[in-house]
Amino acid sequence: MEKVKLTRKNGVLKVDIDGEIIEPLSFKSFRPTERNISDFARAGVKLFSILSSGMISLLEVPYSLYGESWLDDDVYDFEPVDRQIELFMKSAPEGYFALMIQLDTRPWYVKKHNVPYTFTNLSQTIADEEWRRRAADYLKAMIRHTEEKYGDRFYGYFMLCGFTTEWFSHFDEEAPSDIKEKAYKEYLNDPDARIPDKDILEQNSNEAFLAENTREEVEAYRKFHAELIADSILYFAAEAQSVLKHKKLLGVYFGYLFELVGSRLWNDGHLAYEKVFTSPNIDMISSPSSYAFRRGDSTSAFMVTFDTLDRHNKLYYLEFDHITHLAPPDVDGILIPGGDSKLPDHVHTLNVMQRDFMLCAAKGAALWWFDMFEGWFYSDEMMSAIRDMIEISKRFSEKEQKSVSEIAVIASGKDLYCANKNSGLNDLCLGEQREGLARMGAPYDVFSACDADEIDVSRYKLFIFLDAFEPDGKVREFVEKIKESGKTILWIYAPDYAKNGLAGMQKITDMNIVKLIGDEDTVNTHFSKLCFEHLPEPRFFIEDADVVPLGIYKNTEKVAIGAKRFGTYTSVYSAVGNLDGDTLRDIAKTAGVKIYSFDSSVPVYVNSLFLGVYGLEDAEICCDSGVYTDVFTDKKYVSENGKMHIPAGKFASKLLVKDEE
């Protein structure tokens, strides 16, 4: 094998192994066996992930049953990984593999070197120079061994570290250590610098933003905490590339901006994800399918700013690790989280499998099926569905696919350094807002703010800024471009408030926005009541005679959501996050966006080639007139006068391709 790279085929990233284009639909398991590997191989899977780990998982059972390879300082035993690789080679003789290498401090290392355990307290150890060097040496030794012995069968490597292998610094909750204190002084170039005390870091949950008297101190530390982890990933990536020379793909789990709830987004250390997403040394990013969007009546969702990854030619793997109806609820007698609420039967399982596939196919994302502790996919129906999805992906690859989104969503990690991590602000503006976005009936692209100067304004009609609390110069220039283009901007909560206060909000929205005095937990829109358990302070309303009200506070009857049309563009402001699909659809429709579904219970997954529909009940879809084929079933559907009726069936997913005339 000479070189593995990512190649766009008809607009979509694929794995290219010496010119052989392979669909990035893959398999992973903590308990690989001859049966589950060969089942997926026979279904057409060609890419397989192999985990090398002697670590104990969150469930207090081993990640891998094959044993440890990092035995002591500079002492390695590669026999356990060899045995596992040989199983994969035997069970998937035509497969290619990605080795997942766990870099954490082992129990022997913690005892010998007296450092914190990286699996639980990553940020307290990750700056330790000796551990970094020894972990990098282990990483390089494992790669060299694998390449020398099996190089023609490996397409890539994943670097794992931190809680649940996802580079989370979970349990330390930003707490200091001697190692971290030393690194912080060096970061600030200040020998007297101190990590802020816990009572300064843990601020009142009623306040959305950091207190003025501690803001500079806390914001500097939060940035250091996040960059420490991101920069460490890039350190290990550079070390790995010193061996790989970019001839194989390299990946990590990282950047869960939309998923980490509450204070976890700050504590776990993913806010500096842009550095990793844009690094030339990283090729692949992975995350599980969003946990909050897995129910049979939900929509499926990504955890990351997908379109920034795609723009930077990074392959994004969505991990399907849903607990299927066949999955045992426990492993070695220990309940798997969610095991007591697993998918109830094969219909629900196949519905969600197909829905995740439609989400990935519409966006051009990769996907792997995770048979976590074995047996989660042991049914003919499930393997047949996987076989069909692989064949569909191959057929789709022969035709051009591109985004038809007319909505650009912009999110930012760095704009959250100024926010109070206990306020729930990220949940309102980011995590929970995915629900409304998924149900507004139109596709959207989601970018990180680092790409603001590269987004083609002409492609979109509506721009949604979810958390532009502290926009930089690049974002401000982008906003001015939009305002000159005649498009629509939707602002959420407190744009440009963090440094410039109300004056900043008023200038960037071109509206008179005022602080709200009094308690409010409900906003009435034209379509529904938006009810909130907690709205942090400050709260705002619009006091502007030229604004068209779209949402009114229940108690004060002040305008919470409103639109203002100018000669060149339309400004829409919402004082609350987590807008529902109906409200977003109304804003999008007014902006001229093409709407495919006017029913919030029927999400759609759309690109230039197909229209994916997920409907548990009868559905009506807006699409070009003509005959369409559902490629899951080969059933025909007809759209007349731009509308298609889809009766409810046994399965909820329809993947519709218009027949050639």
Residue map of PLM features:
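Polysaccharide-binding and catalytic clefts of secreted carbohydrate-active enzymes
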Residues: 100-102, 110-291, 299-300, 305
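Hydrophobic targeting/anchoring helices
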Residues: 246, 251-432, 517-538, 550-552, ...
